[in-house]
Amino acid sequence: MNILKLSIAGLSIFSFTLTAGQKVTVPASVQGIFEKYCTDCHGAKKKKGDLQLHDIANLEKDFQSNILNKIEEQLFIEEMPPKDEEQLSENELSILSEWIENQYKRMGENSKFQAKLKTPDFGNYVNHEDLFSGKYKDLKGFTPDRRWLINEFIFTEKINQVTNTRQQRNRDGKRVNIHNSSKRNLNITNPFLLPSGSGVRYYDNTMLNGGHLLSMISNAKELSKYLMNERQMSSMAPVYKVMKLELDHDKELEKRQRFLHENIHELMQEIYGEKNKDYLPEFISLNMEATPVSPDGNSYILPDGRKVKKSNHDVAAPKGEYPYIKTAIVKYYVKDQTSAELVRLCEKEWYEKGTGKLKISTRVGFMVNYMSEILRRNKFKPGQFKPKVFKEDDIKLYKEMILKHRQKGDFHNAVIKKSVDEWQAGFEAERKALGELKEPEIIEIINCLFQRILDREPNDGEIQEHLSLMQSYISTLGRREALTKFIETLVLRSEFVYRYEFGDGKADEHGRKMMSPEAAAYALAYAINDSAPDEELRKAVKNGKLNTREDYKREIERMLKRRDLYYLIDERVGQNADGLTNTPIRKLRFFREFFGYPNFPEIFKDNKRLGASYDRIKFRLLEECDQLVDYIISKDKNVFEELLTSDRYYVYHSGDNEQMKKASDDIKKQYEYFKDLDWQNFTYEDFMKHKDFIVESGISHMRGKGEVKWLQRSLGELMMRNKNGKTPDPFKSKLAQSRAKTRLDGISIAHFFNIKFDEWDYPVTQPAALPNRKGILSHPAWLMAFSQNTHTDPVLRGKWIREKLLAGTIPDVPITVEAVVPEDHHKTFRARLEDVTEVKYCWKCHKLMNPLGYAFEMFDDFGRYRTEEALEHPDNLLKKNPDKGTEYEDLRDIFKTQPVITNGHLKGTEDDKLDGDVKNALDLVERLAKSERVRQSIIRHAFRYFMGRNEVLSDSKTLIDADQAYLKSGGSFDAVIVSLLTSDSFIYRKAVKE
């Protein structure tokens, strides 16, 4: 471990107090090191890597800064000097380390390389052996004080909590509340979406930007509007109390306005009698006529003679205006009346009411062209309209207003507006007469809204600050607008979108402090699920029982054991309850992010090449991969090894073994019933003799003769699936249900696993063993996630193994490299990749990836096992198959093939018994699962996931303890979580300079 690496990685966050910007100086001691080790390749004559060090002091400041970063990075990752050259001594490294630090100070800059070390892509840069050797275990772990931006999942739960949104789903015959669903009747934008890709995605170094802010301004307005509706206010007693009278006034005003709109025509007739017509505005008709139609009635004839198709009644009907048309026709329809007369009476009423010209035009236009159809469909009758009879007491108020405000020529809407305005003014005066809100009332409101929006009580200073603010809002805006504004203010506070994790109280001898119990409660809750602390955790805070490491452990273990909460795993999957889990969601999500398999649905795949409908079944495949991971982590034994090597999978299975057995048995009964009948030649009448069984067993509803061919095809599939006495898959059985009790679709996922339906002995108990597969890395979901649209990708697969399992690093692709594999339809993809990557310039990096990825060539880009690769090119086509068929048919075209070569090489476990040539992917994953380095690499990623940052040398003891917890517990991932969340790295916070 070099001194430069210790100076950066041994301190949690390395930064400087900046001074005025000056240029770099190079003392003789540093120049001597450059001349001894560097300038032969990076001097005046040579410029390898576009880097020269002989004249750095005379360069522009920007160039100097870039060179400093390059030097620092190369020394840290020990790439320079090259491994086969003389290496720097500890003293020389110390000189360079001190020089680099001093130069950053002179320039008034922080190291860009150190900033990179905090990002997810650079987590592996800290030397693995240094972390786990015990050499640095005495360094005291902590996490810097931090203000941590929330992620998309926490945001969703926050909004659901603020809005009292509770989603429910069916799960095994009962309704359960679910978390993590953003389905709500509210126009909220989630601005905190995490990046895609495999690996830990949520780090504490994401900064609030303009996009976040703009979205939150819009969200604040939407939330304030939503919380100020009566239903939401009723759940906030102090708010509801001060708004009750205004809400009552609003309802009364709405009632009166609605009554006038519905009845003003009749009221005016009753008030004015024969004189009513003298007050009406002069009627100006639109005089619309029906558009001429062709003799066959199917087309309109336009003025220029062109014909356009006439829409049918249902298409042409103006949906928003149709109710007004029907209401008016009921009122004016009489026997022997012409359509023109009826239209005119309706139009006149709308005109007098003050209905807009566009609306009248829409209504009249539809009536003149479709009157006969309107009358026929609605079966209007003369005398159907019964004038309303009003009680004098009920209409006294309205009559007074009409008499007071109506002027000759007024449209009805004008009279209504004048009346409503007067009532509105009266209500406002009534409320104003009650006086201003008292201070205690406002304080109650402040407390209530703080609790609702920020999930805490305000302190005394905040109460006084917001009391003045609320009083100002109320005096200038009124109660409703003041409350709306105050809600927006709280939503836009930084604590709504940030997690605050700062040390509190007295520091220990190392300058570290524990978090406050309140902050710790949120840190623990967000580590295990995405919600605010549950009631038990809040009680622990209130009762002073979240102050010690043992307190943390007790609460963590309790939360990990909870199974009464259900979480939506992935909103893309749809509404099936199979997409739910009652495993604490962040426990499952770690492995989803670590393996990266949920990314595969974003990769386009061709249906024809799969031989089935890819888009219809891809999310079923994702669900079943989630089921497998959930199953393994719920067992919580040898979790890493099982995830890497288990040969058991779910294939077309809900996870309910008992229910799936019943479904398969149902198929067997259908087979037994029909196997000896001449169903191939049945007529509809023949099938009707067996109607009771057909309907009861779910084969068909028997709704007509058109089902004969469908029945025969279904029975043909039934016979095929019951061949040779094997257990049939339960597809199309009414008992083949998801956990939501809906039909279980997606039988075609069997194509991914090389299953032939006429040979499939369906395992009703799953997960079940499958040949030629071991673990998640041979699950089609993972294999497709690390593939391209039309071919495999050994580079991506090898890179993932190198970085995620072997704690290795891969340099970035140089910008001068065009990473394209040449086309050659006579060669396998591996052969083409070897041609382009195994040249000297490329092999330096590709040797770290390709030999690992080559082992997975035993699977194609859909994750199907293979021994030969189809050379998919028109010149190699042997047989063209149909583009469409049943779920059971393999529709792939047949091409010439070449044998696939699956041998590879494992290097990087640092174990001679494991490193070496491998036969294929199964051999590779077996070796990986036995590797100490692989186990520790997964734990490093778990550290990043639960801490929200990269590990540094002061976290060495935390990582060693987590590794030992896994081993001593028999491979429990819960034990790893408990160890991490009770470590010094999690418990302690410390202020560091930024």
Task: Give residue spans per PLM region.
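Bacterial N-terminal signal peptides
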Residues: 5-15
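Sequence context surrounding c-type heme c attachment/ligation sites in exported
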Residues: 20-98, 766-921, 925-929, 935, ...
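Aromatic- and Gly/Pro-enriched helix-to-coil junctions and flexible linker segments
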Residues: 20-354, 361-365, 369-384, 388, ...
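A cross-family structural signal marking well-folded subdomains
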Residues: 181-285, 314-327, 331-391, 395-399, ...
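Aromatic-lined, polymer-binding surfaces characteristic
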Residues: 435-438, 446, 476, 480-503, ...
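Core structural elements
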Residues: 448-454, 486-497, 585-600, 946-950
